[in-house]
């Protein structure tokens, strides 16, 4: 649904790419995550980091991203570095640069905090990371001004039990994979969804 104000401001974008205006409190603390050590990923990280700094917002990176071998900190003015497990608790918005795998990897650390995630696609498919790298700074400014559409994703909660004892529990975005480990052999398991046998 496009309005005339959006059309005037964004004439070069296709209608399906326009964000709808949803006014929300401003995002002030922006997390930035990336997983692959490819130069293309770090180029986008630097571009986004500089956009965040230009807007006088707080830039926060997780340790794993900060330690990417191709990331040059002389190209980034100000950044706070925290443990990955804390980034969802501290940030109002997290930007993930990479492919869908990077988004899924980040979701592991972010899911319990319900922090919004913006994916910049440096992978192949981009079902989850749908912002193109050459549009990243522009789209980020739109989001930070309140022009965006929030897409809620369902989360899976998974428990592994031995009898009544829970031996592992976790959250997942797309799927849960059960496997026997390093050696390939049959495994016996019972699966329930919402307490019902499947």
Range-by-range predicted roles:
Residues 1-93, 134-149, 160-170:
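ATP/NTP phosphate-donor binding region
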Residues 109-127:
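Gly/Ser-rich helix-loop-strand patches that form or flank binding pockets
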Residues 37, 100-102, 125:
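Short glycine-rich anion-binding loops that position phosphate/pyrophosphate groups of nucleotides
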Residues 41-42, 101-107:
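Short glycine/serine/threonine-rich phosphate/pyrophosphate-binding segments
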Residues 64-66, 100, 122-123:
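Short, ordered loop/turn segments at secondary-structure junctions
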Residues 124-198:
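Catalytic core of DAGKc-family lipid kinases
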Residues 46-51, 111-112, 193-194:
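Short, solvent-exposed amphipathic alpha-helical segments in soluble enzyme
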């Amino acid at each position: 649904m496009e309005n005339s104000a959006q059309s005037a401001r964004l004439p070069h974008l296709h209608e399906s790419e326009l964000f709808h205006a949803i006014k929300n409190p401003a995002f002030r603390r922006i997390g930035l995550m990336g997983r692959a050590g490819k130069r293309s990923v770090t180029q986008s990280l630097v571009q986004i980091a500089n956009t965040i700094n230009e807007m006088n917002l707080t830039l926060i990176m997780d340790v794993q991203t900060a330690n990417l071998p191709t990331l040059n900190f002389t190209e980034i003015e100000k950044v706070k570095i925290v443990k990955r497990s804390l980034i969802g608790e501290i940030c109002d918005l997290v930007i993930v640069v990479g492919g869908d795998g990077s988004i899924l990897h980040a979701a592991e650390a972010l899911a319990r905090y319900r922090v919004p995630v913006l994916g910049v696609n440096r992978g192949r498919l981009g079902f989850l990371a749908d912002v193109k790298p050459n549009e990243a700074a522009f789209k980020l400014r739109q989001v930070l001004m309140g022009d965006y559409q929030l897409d809620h994703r369902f989360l899976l909660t998974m428990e592994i039990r031995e009898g009544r004892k829970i031996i592992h529990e976790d959250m997942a975005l797309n799927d849960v994979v059960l496997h026997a480990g390093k050696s390939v052999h049959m495994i016996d398991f019972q699966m329930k969804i919402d307490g019902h046998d499947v």
